[in-house]
């Protein structure tokens, strides 16, 4: 696997550093998207966020910081390298109703799968509805992931009625 490309060299790991403006701008962009969807008539419980790699980490960070819950968050090949204390210190309790699907390749050499496993344990201990699926690929999304994502979306939307 190659190291790939990031649209920003600043990651969520840099959140508390002087270069955190990229992370902050990303959070504002996601928030603006949610607000725009609401203005168009979507309810928050019908809005889902999906992120891959760096986007997965940003989507998880966005979820825990919100004063509301969304329909769900799908994080593919990205997770926190943080300890539970860091997450709980930054957690908004209102966000805990957002279901989370974590997916990660067990052969990922770019973002270690242990980060998704760590994220799963943290979110589970904090009371989130969280699922973790590991698959035998590297830093990519296998075709079989489509069915898992589809089932997650269907299950969450069925829970809304």
Residue spans of the language-model regions?
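Serine-hydrolase catalytic machinery in alpha/beta-hydrolase-like enzymes
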Residues: 1-46
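Flexible "cap/lid" loop of the alpha/beta hydrolase fold
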Residues: 4-13, 79-99
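Short beta-strand immediately N-terminal to the catalytic nucleophile in serine-hydrolase-like folds
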Residues: 49-51, 76, 103
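Gly/Ala-rich beta-loop-alpha elbow adjacent to hydrolase catalytic centers
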Residues: 50-55, 59
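Active-site signature of alpha/beta-hydrolase-fold catalytic machinery across serine-
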Residues: 61-65
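A conserved short beta-strand
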Residues: 68-81
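C-terminal catalytic histidine-bearing segment of alpha/beta-hydrolase fold enzymes
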Residues: 101, 114-161
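Short beta-strand/loop motif that positions the catalytic acidic residue
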Residues: 101-104, 108
């Amino acid at each position: 696997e190659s190291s790939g490309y990031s649209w920003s060299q600043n990651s969520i790991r840099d959140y508390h550093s002087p270069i955190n403006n990229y992370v902050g701008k990303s959070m504002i962009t996601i928030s603006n998207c949610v607000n725009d969807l609401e203005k168009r008539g979507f309810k928050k419980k019908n809005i889902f966020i999906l992120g891959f790699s760096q986007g997965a980490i940003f989507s998880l960070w966005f979820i825990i910081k919100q004063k509301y819950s969304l329909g769900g968050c799908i994080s593919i090949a990205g997770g926190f390298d943080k300890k539970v204390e860091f997450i709980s210190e930054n957690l908004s309790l209102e966000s805990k109703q957002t279901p989370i699907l974590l997916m990660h390749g067990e052969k990922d050499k770019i973002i270690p799968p242990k980060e998704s496993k760590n994220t799963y344990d943290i979110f589970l201990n904090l009371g989130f509805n969280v699922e973790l699926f590991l698959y035998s690929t590297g830093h990519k999304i296998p075709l079989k992931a489509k069915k898992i994502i589809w089932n997650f979306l269907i299950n969450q939307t069925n829970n809304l009625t």
